[in-house]
A protein has these predicted regions:
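Alpha-helical adaptor scaffolds
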Residues: 6-72
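Register position in tetratricopeptide repeats
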Residues: 18, 52, 86, 118-121, ...
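Canonical tetratricopeptide repeat
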Residues: 45, 79, 113-114, 118
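Mid-chain, well-packed structural core segment of small domains
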Residues: 66-87
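Alpha-helical linker/edge segments of TPR/alpha-solenoid repeat scaffolds
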Residues: 92-95, 119-139
Length: 139
């Protein structure tokens, strides 16, 4: 496929994702990921689909792959952070959110606001766990 055809397919896949047709969107992004293995966006999109379908391990793997290809992919960072949060990996989640916020110091990307909110929730979870820990563990 040519670049314009890949873009057209990606736009179709995104539209299907937005409409909640995750199985069809998944097929498109799996095909695109095979066609262009160096494009991080396709893996980020797959991760978002897996996340929406509650396939957290598959989502984590897709976001990891996306971030290997593009370490500055804020969508992959925020979404991977959410996966970590849902898996109970609070520190990993907080790190991903912090990296996403660092990538957008002027807070122009809507994902950054989401990252800030989720980071605050992660920190609150850590602080609540520390407050409720037995005194022996706090030493």
């Amino acid at each position: 496929m040519s670049s314009p055809e890949l873009l057209e397919r990606a736009m179709e896949g995104f539209r299907l994702y937005e409409e909640g047709d995750y199985p069809e969107a998944r097929l498109i992004f799996e095909e695109l990921a095979q066609q262009d293995p160096l494009e991080a966006y396709y893996r980020t999109a797959l991760g978002a689909i897996y996340l929406a379908e509650d396939e957290l391990d598959a989502a984590l793997e897709a976001f990891d792959e996306a971030l290997k290809l593009n370490p500055k992919d804020s969508a992959a960072l925020v979404n991977r952070g959410e996966v970590h949060l849902r898996l109970g990996n609070i520190m990993e989640a907080a790190q991903d959110f912090a990296r996403a916020v660092d990538l957008d110091p002027e807070n122009k990307d809507p994902l950054t606001m989401r990252a800030r909110l989720l980071a605050a929730a992660a920190i609150e979870t850590i602080e609540a766990a520390q407050r409720s820990a037995p005194a022996e563990l706090k030493k």
